[in-house]
């Protein structure tokens, strides 16, 4: 009788890629539902359109590469990328933008570098940056949350606006839900007000803010935080990167707020505005484009958090996670090289 000799642990549980992706997608659903509740049906339409484009592009590329189409589609990676792009862009953005961004993410960013497990950059964030740089007006046009808007677009109106059909529906109907409210996000509004000489306290009196956070965005971030905690409980991701992102952003924003409270947003505003929780738990934790060692993951996450604060306060794009994640992706190989775990019985050198 032959015995297989192997080191512990002897009982392991291997999660397939498709299982991990399914868990991530399921944990995204609470945030998606809350986002749709505040910003209308457009978000759901964008997500469904992105999924259709992503699966089509994935199948086409696999066909050209003579690979197994069914296996590639069933790993759910393309679907996850599509959902992340769909929730990141404004809900009423034109249909061709989500098509362009999703196709770019799947064909160029993912498969041009070799496919799943070989891409250097996060596909969803690379697509977001492409759209933001190419079409800044459309990518910064968010409607007012339903709780403060006089009229929120219905499903039919959302479809008409996204696909540009129906002459009686236009974006102007949702531009000013309440007096003085533009179609900018709370982070955009705060940055614009500060550049005009207003203090943080004066800016926060506007109706788009609810105390120290943006209307609707606090609950959206809270929903993504809840989904992220479930994701940690399911062990689909590790805690290092998410903790690093939130700690890096919290420490940097706390220092800035303590030094200049009149010209800086509070740490609570930074943590629960924009895509903070979505990025911390669902984007930055992409194992392909992140650092690999435990210490390296913490450094990687902290780098993202600090970069987000710097870009939000000094740069031109208040919700800076896409740029921060891509810059950290570039640094991941260097972090892995210089922060290598010590092998037992060997020196660190």
From Swiss-Prot:
Membrane topology: Multi-pass membrane protein
Entry GO terms, CC: plasma membrane
Listed EC numbers: 7.-.-.-
Keywords in alphabetical order: Cell inner membrane, Cell membrane, Electron transport, Flavoprotein, FMN, Membrane, Phosphoprotein, Translocase, Transmembrane, Transmembrane helix, Transport
Function summary: Part of a membrane-bound complex that couples electron transfer with translocation of ions across the membrane.
Modified residues (FMN phosphoryl threonine): 185
Parts of the chain that traverse the membrane: 20-42, 77-99, 124-144, 212-232, 239-259, 265-285, 291-311, 315-335
UniProt cofactor(s): FMN
Subunit structure as annotated in this protein's UniProt entry: The complex is composed of six subunits: RnfA, RnfB, RnfC, RnfD, RnfE and RnfG.
Record-linked Pfam families: NQR2_RnfD_RnfE
Family according to the record: Belongs to the NqrB/RnfD family.
Name of the molecule in the record: Ion-translocating oxidoreductase complex subunit D
GO annotation, biological process: electron transport chain; transmembrane transport
Xref: PANTHER family: ELECTRON TRANSPORT COMPLEX PROTEIN RNFD, ION-TRANSLOCATING OXIDOREDUCTASE COMPLEX SUBUNIT D
Enzyme class: translocase
Subcellular location: Cell inner membrane
Main location: membrane
């Amino acid at each position: 009788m032959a015995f297989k000799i192997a080191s512990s642990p002897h009982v392991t549980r291997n999660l397939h890629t498709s299982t991990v992706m399914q868990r991530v997608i399921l944990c995204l659903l609470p945030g998606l539902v809350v986002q749709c509740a505040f910003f209308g049906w457009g978000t759901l339409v964008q997500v469904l359109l992105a999924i259709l484009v992503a699966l089509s592009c994935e199948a086409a590329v696999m066909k050209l590469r003579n690979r197994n189409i069914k296996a590639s589609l069933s790993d759910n990676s393309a679907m996850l990328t599509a959902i992340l792009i769909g929730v990141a862009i404004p809900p009423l953005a034109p249909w061709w933008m989500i098509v362009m961004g999703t196709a770019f993410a799947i064909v160029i960013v993912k498969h041009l570098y070799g496919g799943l497990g070989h891409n250097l950059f996060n596909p969803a964030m690379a697509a977001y940056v492409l759209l933001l740089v190419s079409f800044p007006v459309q990518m910064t046009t968010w409607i007012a949350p339903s709780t403060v808007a006089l009229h929120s677009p219905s499903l039919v109106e959302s479809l008409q606006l996204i696909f540009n059909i129906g002459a009686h529906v236009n974006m102007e109907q949702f531009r000013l839900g309440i007096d003085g409210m533009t179609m900018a996000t709370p982070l955009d509004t705060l940055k614009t007000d500060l550049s005009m000489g207003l203090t943080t306290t004066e800016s926060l009196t506007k109706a788009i803010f609810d105390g120290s956070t943006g209307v609707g965005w606090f609950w959206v971030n809270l929903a993504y935080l809840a989904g992220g905690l479930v994701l940690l409980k399911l062990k689909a991701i590790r805690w290092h990167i998410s903790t690093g992102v939130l700690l890096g952003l919290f420490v940097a924003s706390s220092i800035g707020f303590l030094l200049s409270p009149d010209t800086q947003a509070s740490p609570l505003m930074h943590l629960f505005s924009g895509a903070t929780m979505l990025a911390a738990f669902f984007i930055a934790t992409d194992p392909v484009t992140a650092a690999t060692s435990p210490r390296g993951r913490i450094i990687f996450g902290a780098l993202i958090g600090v970069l987000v604060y710097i870009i939000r306060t000094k740069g031109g794009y208040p919700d800076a996670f896409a740029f921060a994640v891509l810059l950290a992706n570039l640094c991941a190989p260097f972090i892995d090289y210089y922060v290598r775990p010590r092998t037992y019985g060997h020196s660190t050198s």
